[in-house]
Amino acid sequence: MYTHTQETQSKMTPVSSLQNLREGNKRFQENVRLSRNLVQQVRETASGQYPYATVLSCIDSRVSSELIFDQGMGDLFSIRIAGNFVNEDILGSMEFACKLAGTKLVVV
């Protein structure tokens, strides 16, 4: 599994981003996760991050977007808040993720 670069992120579309999340969720349901070197991913994302999707989810400690979608470090911008509602702070984070960081998809 690779860490996204600016080039790979730019090739992603909303459709391919959603497909990645669906495939990852299927792996999660089947308890078959991709093998990742987390130490390597930390190094590879140290100089920049190029997530392809933004996920707004509940603050519930039992649910992590990276786990339920079987994604690695730097793949998602995860925004967590009680009740999954959007206020100015959350909206600002979502705008940053899409406009400045280049995510292709927002999932609530």
Segments from the language model and where they lie:
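Short, intrinsically disordered/low-complexity patches at protein termini
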Residues: 53-54, 101-103
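Well-ordered alpha/beta subsegment
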Residues: 104-108
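Short, conserved "active-site rim" segments that organize catalytic pockets and cofactor/ligand binding
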Residues: 3-85
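Thiamine diphosphate
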Residues: 88-101
